[in-house]
Amino acid sequence: MGKKLVMAQKRGETRALCLGVAMVVCAAITYYILGTTVLPLYQKSVWTQESTCHLVETNIKDQEELEGRKVPQYPCLWVNVSAVGRWAMLYHTEDTRDQNQQCSYIPRNLDNYQTALVDVKKVRANFYKHHNFYCFSAPQVNETSVVYQRLYGPQILLFSFFWPTFLLTGGLLIIAMVKLNRSLSVLAAQK
């Protein structure tokens, strides 16, 4: 009976130890992936200063108005605001500026032009309802653009690193409990 209990205990310890090591390895892989994808985007984001933006004007540009340039196949909302004592171009997110520097907002549904136009008009109406709103500006003096919503802010970074940290802590606790259990069983066997 005692030998069966020791064998079952060893198998359970081995399984728990493998679980703990697997959790630590998964956490390390996740840290690596997040460190190479999310962290550089967070460090690249220059819009760190939260400020109040005041709406100056909005305009919906269609294909006809953008002659001579790369013409987007969707209606383009252009928003000009006053922020931190200077005029600036408002972009919905950091990615909006990278996709098209002429547009403040790019609609979600780009397949249907009329649906995209309705979406752009709805966003424009929201700007007219709320003339003052919070935005993010760059601390550099020569920056002429502001961002309405940060995709890569500190909250996203904290949320991204929470689960791998939880996984790493859980794995280390399981490994520590198995080691503690082994040392206590050795001490009990010596008495």
From Swiss-Prot:
GO terms for biological process: cellular response to bile acid; cellular response to ethanol; cellular response to hypoxia; detection of calcium ion; positive regulation of potassium ion transmembrane transport; response to calcium ion; vasodilation. It is a multi-pass membrane protein. Residues 40-155 are extracellular. Keywords: Glycoprotein, Ion channel, Ion transport, Membrane, Transmembrane, Transmembrane helix, Transport. The chain crosses the membrane at residues 19-39, 156-176. It holds the Pfam family CaKB. Weakly expressed. In brain, it is expressed in a few discrete populations of neurons that also express KCNMA1. GO terms for molecular function: calcium-activated potassium channel activity; potassium channel regulator activity. It is found in: Membrane. N-glycosylated. Glycans are attached at residues 80, 142. InterPro entries: K_chnl_Ca-activ_BK_bsu (IPR003930). One of its GO terms (cellular component) is plasma membrane. It comes from the Eukaryota. Residues 1-18, 177-191 are cytoplasmic. Belongs to the KCNMB (TC 8.A.14.1) family. KCNMB1 subfamily. Interacts with KCNMA1 tetramer. There are probably 4 molecules of KCMNB1 per KCNMA1 tetramer. Regulatory subunit of the calcium activated potassium KCNMA1 (maxiK) channel. Modulates the calcium sensitivity and gating kinetics of KCNMA1, thereby contributing to KCNMA1 channel diversity. Increases the apparent Ca(2+)/voltage sensitivity of the KCNMA1 channel. It also modifies KCNMA1 channel kinetics and alters its pharmacological properties. It slows down the activation and the deactivation kinetics of the channel. Acts as a negative regulator of smooth muscle contraction by enhancing the calcium sensitivity to KCNMA1. This is Calcium-activated potassium channel subunit beta-1.
